[in-house]
């Protein structure tokens, strides 16, 4: 789950990190009132969406009058912002962040992720702020400095100082950096972050460090113990099919292919997508129905898959470990009858009662294509999707 910039900065402020005075607004009038409340003669107005590249897409602007603030909000609220990180439809803009203007002398980068290789939280800092860190990692990796956080003792001030020296900070800035580093380290574990970025972390004209932007990703598996973070959830920023699937405990991710995939188990689902791709097909989705694949969940999964107009065939790949294949077969038959599937359906069953399951499908009288193996299933579904 991702947070909006204004939500990230709200958390930053609670942990004593330096952020701009700002207000998230729902209407042009509210945005104008926020600018007046902040004061001054210059403001930054930002569209709030779960995507980067807002500035290049016109979603961030420096304005000098209240009328400009109001016009920016009126122009964007209720519309979609399309950036290089969104699809062609873009993301809906429901809030505008109005902030005080910050004079920038230099831009740095500070971020943290859960590193699977070291199995620790790793902080990254760079003098190359304000640009995509992936670009820096690819072109000049020596400019990215890292600090691994020991989970037993947490972030340490000496680690912050080591990074600060590499960033060329002066003694005053070093103190500020240590405070920011320690606050972010505590915040990362307190709220079960998966990703954290301040890009840019700026040095102002007065020589102070300031968190100019904020990007936070939360570990979705930890939301059950994060009631405060759950309140930040914005379903408008998610694919409607993915949100609908989650309500039925289905793990669904929309893709851009034409072969719908319904599988039990995330690993098997990824393997299924790989073999479809290997045989010349393009998966339209990732969909894991989980271990308890009941008729109701299979039926809902079919509905979600078929809501994508690009789907020309569906591959159902079930391994009967926890559940019996004959029971799954009955669920598939019931779902096909209920939903009224009008594209070819290829089913591969393996595991407990697999032979019985295939027999149930064969005797159903429905136009369901049975597959003997995963390779056979992939070949048949790709051919079916191509109309062969």
Swiss-Prot record:
At which positions is ATP bound?
46, 53-55, 99, 102, 107
Residues in domain ATP-grasp? 9-244
* Catalytic reaction equation(s): succinate + ATP + CoA = succinyl-CoA + ADP + phosphate; GTP + succinate + CoA = succinyl-CoA + GDP + phosphate
**Transmembrane stretches, by residue range?**
none
Any single GO molecular-function term of the entry would be: succinate-CoA ligase (ADP-forming) activity
UniProt pathway annotation: Carbohydrate metabolism; tricarboxylic acid cycle; succinate from succinyl-CoA (ligase route): step 1/1
Q: Pfam families from the xrefs?
A: ATP-grasp_2 (PF08442), Ligase_CoA (PF00549)
Which residues does the record give as Mg(2+) binding sites? Answer: 199, 213
Q: What is its EC number?
A: 6.2.1.5
Q: Which GO terms describe its biological process?
A: succinyl-CoA metabolic process; tricarboxylic acid cycle
Question: What keywords are annotated for this sequence in UniProt?
Answer: ATP-binding, Ligase, Magnesium, Metal-binding, Nucleotide-binding, Tricarboxylic acid cycle
Annotated cofactor note = Binds 1 Mg(2+) ion per subunit.
GO cellular-component term (any): succinate-CoA ligase complex
**Co-factor(s):** Mg(2+)
- List ligand-binding residues for substrate: 264, 321-323
Would you identify the family this protein belongs to, as annotated?
Answer: Belongs to the succinate/malate CoA ligase beta subunit family.
What's the subunit arrangement here? Heterotetramer of two alpha and two beta subunits.
Per the entry, what this protein does is: Succinyl-CoA synthetase functions in the citric acid cycle (TCA), coupling the hydrolysis of succinyl-CoA to the synthesis of either ATP or GTP and thus represents the only step of substrate-level phosphorylation in the TCA. The beta subunit provides nucleotide specificity of the enzyme and binds the substrate succinate, while the binding sites for coenzyme A and phosphate are found in the alpha subunit.
Supply the name of the protein. Answer: Succinate--CoA ligase [ADP-forming] subunit beta
Originating species: Pseudoalteromonas translucida (strain TAC 125)
What gene is this protein translated from? sucC
């Amino acid at each position: 789950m991702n947070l909006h910039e204004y939500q990230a900065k709200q958390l930053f402020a609670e942990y004593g990190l330096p952020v701009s005075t700002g207000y998230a607004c729902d209407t042009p009038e509210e945005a104008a009132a926020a600018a007046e409340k902040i004061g001054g003669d210059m403001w930054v107005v930002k569209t709030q969406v779960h995507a980067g590249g807002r500035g290049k897409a016109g979603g961030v602007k420096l304005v000098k009058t209240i009328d400009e603030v109001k016009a920016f909000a009126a122009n964007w609220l209720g519309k979609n912002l399309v950036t290089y990180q969104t699809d062609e439809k873009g993301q809906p803009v429901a809030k505008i962040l109005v902030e005080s203007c910050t004079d920038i002398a230099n831009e740095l980068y500070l971020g943290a992720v859960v590193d699977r290789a070291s199995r620790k939280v790793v902080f990254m800092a760079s003098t190359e702020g304000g640009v995509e860190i992936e670009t820096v990692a690819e072109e000049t990796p020596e400019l990215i400095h890292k600090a691994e956080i020991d989970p037993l003792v947490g972030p340490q001030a000496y680690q912050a100082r080591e990074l600060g020296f590499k960033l060329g900070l002066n003694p005053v800035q070093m103190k500020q950096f240590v405070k920011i580093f320690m606050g972010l380290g505590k915040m990362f574990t307190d709220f079960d972050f998966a990703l954290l970025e301040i890009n840019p972390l700026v040095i102002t004209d007065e020589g102070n460090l300031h968190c100019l932007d904020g990007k936070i990703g939360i570990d979705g598996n930890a939301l059950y113990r994060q009631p405060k973070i759950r309140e930040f959830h914005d379903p408008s920023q998610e694919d409607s099919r993915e949100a609908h699937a989650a309500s039925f405990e289905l793990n669904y991710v929309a893709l851009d292919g034409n072969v719908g995939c319904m599988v039990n188990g995330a690993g098997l689902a990824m393997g299924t997508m790989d073999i479809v791709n290997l045989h010349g097909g393009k998966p339209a989705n990732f969909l894991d129905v989980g271990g308890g694949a009941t008729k109701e969940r299979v039926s809902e999964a079919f509905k979600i898959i078929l809501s994508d107009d690009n789907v020309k065939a569906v591959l159902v790949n079930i391994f009967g470990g926890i559940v019996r294949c004959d029971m799954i077969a009955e669920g598939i038959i019931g779902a096909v009858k209920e939903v009224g599937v009008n594209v070819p359906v290829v089913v591969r069953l393996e595991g407990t009662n697999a032979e019985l399951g295939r027999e149930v499908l064969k005797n159903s009288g429905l136009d369901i294509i049975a597959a003997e193996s995963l390779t056979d299933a992939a070949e048949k579904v790709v051919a079916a999707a191509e109309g062969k």
